[in-house]
């Protein structure tokens, strides 16, 4: 049984509230779960202490038993110091794409041609 530490949505329409739960990966998002280990209220201010509440001991227990946290839950665990999140680094993403580089080269060529024409 593949276990996940994930968010289950609660609350009402346009007023989200999430429970941090231990659930089988095959069960529905808001469906059956084994244990509730925390909560996240995104409606509260980011610096509010009650925005994210976690039961660190139970989460460590489930992590030791093979439960895998989802990306968002892993962020919460990293902030709480329960688990370490690897920093994603993609330096290639900041570079312009092939078409953008071609357009920049054409623009530079036109500027150089215009400068040469005015110099003559």
Curated annotation (Swiss-Prot):
This is Small ribosomal subunit protein bS16. PANTHER family: 30S RIBOSOMAL PROTEIN S16 (PTHR12919), SMALL RIBOSOMAL SUBUNIT PROTEIN BS16M (PTHR12919:SF20). GO terms for molecular function: structural constituent of ribosome. InterPro entries: Ribosomal_bS16, Ribosomal_bS16_dom_sf. SUPFAM superfamilies: Ribosomal protein S16 (SSF54565). Residues 84-120 are annotated as: Disordered. It comes from the Bacteria. Residues 111-120 have a biased composition (Low complexity). Belongs to the bacterial ribosomal protein bS16 family. The gene is rpsP. It comes from Rhizobium rhizogenes (strain K84 / ATCC BAA-868) (Agrobacterium radiobacter). Pfam families: Ribosomal_S16. Keywords: Ribonucleoprotein, Ribosomal protein. GO terms for biological process: translation.
């Amino acid at each position: 049984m593949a276990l996940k530490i994930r968010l289950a949505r609660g609350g009402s329409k346009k007023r989200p509230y999430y429970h941090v739960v231990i659930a089988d990966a095959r069960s529905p998002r808001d469906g059956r779960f084994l244990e509730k280990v925390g909560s996240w209220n995104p409606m509260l201010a980011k610096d509010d202490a009650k925005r994210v509440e976690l039961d660190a001991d139970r989460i460590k227990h489930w992590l030791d038993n093979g439960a895998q946290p989802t990306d968002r839950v892993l962020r919460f665990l990293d902030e709480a110091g329960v688990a370490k999140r690897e920093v994603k680094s993609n330096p290639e993403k900041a570079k312009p794409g092939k078409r953008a580089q071609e357009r920049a080269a054409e623009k530079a060529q036109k500027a150089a041609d215009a400068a040469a024409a005015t110099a003559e």
